[in-house]
């Protein structure tokens, strides 16, 4: 990996890690629906000029049905779940929970598209699930004022990312990333609009919340997508997906620096176990095999 690619990877991880920080700042004033509508709407406006310049709009229009599904699964639903969780959970916790996204992608691919899931990746999946258990062990309180619903929202959001990735692979594999991203943001904006309108804040929103929202939409969504596309073109999908391992680092760091969050031993242990499992699931780490042995598939 070239130095420029490494810098891009670090910058992208820092930006995506910051999305959890900005959600924590903005969601108390906007609420989940309006905040996520602004996120996808402003992101769409950021990407749309580039799509127009590259002549992608006719292609988006022809494939609008499949792209709309991506908008729901990859943006509207998971973004809304994270925004709901951000009302009570820390940025660091959510960024660690997000690290299981590639794991769900592998599982859904195995169940739906019959992709091979070698034994080593099955072990990685099991380890990641164990990491989630460690992470949420003492937070599943469903009593009044408990964090249980928020925790379920945070750990469910990556599942929809995994479904979206496989939907894209199944129905939109021939569509370029810019068209898919732009179209899905427009679709997500249309999906979230009714909820946003019906729950729009009745009181004025502070400039701090507006600033966090604009950063979340333009920097952490629109700009981040463009950076991610560039990384894929430069280092390939496997290299680009390694950003998964860096996002929790920055998510935790920003939470500590700007929100005075406390990094508990439980969060660190959960993060370590999840990241080891994710690395195995992605095939980025080779399990020591005896000479001449071959990994089995399930």
Residue ranges and their predicted role:
Residues 36-38, 75, 79, 93-100, ...:
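Helix-helix packing/entry segments at the starts of transmembrane helices
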Residues 47, 68, 108, 117-139, ...:
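Hydrophobic transmembrane alpha-helices of multi-pass small-molecule transport proteins
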Residues 47, 105-107, 111, 142-199, ...:
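Transmembrane alpha-helical segments that form core, pore/gating elements
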Residues 46-59, 82, 101-126, 249-269:
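C-terminal transmembrane-helix exit sites in multi-pass transporters
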Residues 1-6, 29-33, 37, 59-65, ...:
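Juxtamembrane helix-entry segments on the extracytoplasmic side of multipass membrane proteins
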Residues 15, 19-23, 48-98, 134, ...:
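Specific transmembrane alpha-helical segments of multi-pass solute transporters/efflux pumps
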Residues 29-77, 104, 160-164, 181-199, ...:
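Transmembrane alpha-helices of multi-pass small-molecule transport proteins
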Residues 14-44, 84, 90-92, 163-187, ...:
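Juxtamembrane helix-loop-helix junctions in multi-pass membrane proteins
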């Amino acid at each position: 990996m070239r130095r420029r690619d490494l810098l891009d990877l670090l910058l992208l991880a820092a930006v995506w890690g910051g999305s959890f920080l900005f959600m924590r700042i903005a969601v108390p004033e906007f609420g989940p629906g309006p905040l996520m509508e602004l996120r996808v709407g402003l992101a769409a406006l950021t990407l749309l000029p580039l799509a127009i310049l590259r002549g992608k709009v006719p292609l988006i229009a022809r494939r609008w049905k499949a792209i709309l599904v991506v908008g729901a699964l990859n943006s509207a639903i998971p973004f809304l779940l994270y925004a709901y969780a951000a009302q009570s959970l820390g940025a660091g916790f959510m960024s660690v929970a997000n690290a299981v996204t590639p794991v769900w992608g592998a599982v859904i691919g195995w169940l739906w598209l019959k992709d091979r899931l070698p034994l080593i990746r099955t072990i990685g999946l099991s380890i990641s699930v164990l990491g989630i258990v460690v992470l949420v062990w003492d937070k599943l309180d469903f009593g009044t004022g408990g964090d249980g619903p928020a925790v379920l929202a945070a750990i469910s959001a990556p599942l929809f990312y995994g479904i979206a990735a496989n939907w894209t692979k199944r129905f939109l594999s021939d569509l370029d990333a810019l068209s898919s991203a732009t179209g899905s943001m427009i679709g997500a904006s249309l999906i979230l609009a009714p909820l946003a309108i019906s729950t729009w804040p009745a009181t004025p929103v502070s400039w701090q919340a507006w600033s966090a929202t604009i950063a979340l939409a333009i920097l952490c969504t629109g700009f981040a997508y463009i950076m991610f596309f560039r990384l894929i073109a430069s280092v390939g999908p496997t290299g680009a997906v390694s950003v998964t391992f860096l996002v929790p680092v920055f998510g935790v760091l920003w939470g500590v620096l700007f929100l005075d969050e406390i990094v508990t031993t439980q969060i660190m242990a959960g993060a370590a176990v999840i990241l080891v499992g994710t690395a195995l699931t992605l095939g980025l780490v080779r399990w020591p095999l005896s000479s001449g042995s071959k990994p089995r598939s399930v």
